[in-house]
From Swiss-Prot:
The gene is rnfH. It comes from Escherichia coli O81 (strain ED1a). Belongs to the UPF0125 (RnfH) family. HAMAP family: UPF0125_RnfH. InterPro entries: Mopterin_synth/thiamin_S_b, RnfH, RnfH_sf. NCBIfam families: PRK01777.1. This is Protein RnfH. It holds the Pfam family Ub-RnfH.
Length: 96
């Protein structure tokens, strides 16, 4: 008979951070942890088909199994291409 595990689910915005602790059955998935956290109801901007997720900063799939003490993170979409931003900074530095 599987036991219980405690997992944190985190979602951070520039102005506010959400951190929900949930208790799940052993063998629960990342998606189950997110749904149990209630963040999908609190934040309608979270779309699990678009937002990437991770466990302690390591990319994860919604189907990955979570373990006791894990922190599941929901990442916001990038608003700018990092390569493009680096290119622009390099051009700006070269023009000085």
């Amino acid at each position: 008979m599987p036991g219980k595990i405690a997992v944190e689910v985190a979602y951070a915005l520039p102005e506010k951070q959400y951190l929900q602790r949930v208790t799940l059955q052993e063998g629960a998935t990342v998606e189950e942890a997110i749904r149990a956290s209630g963040l999908l109801e609190l934040r309608t901007d979270i779309d699990l088909t678009k937002n990437k997720v991770g466990i302690y900063s390591h990319p994860a799939k919604l189907s990955d199994i979570v373990h006791d003490g894990d922190r599941v993170e929901i990442y916001r979409p990038l608003i700018a291409d990092p390569k493009e931003l680096r290119r622009q900074r390099a051009e700006k530095s070269a023009n000085k």
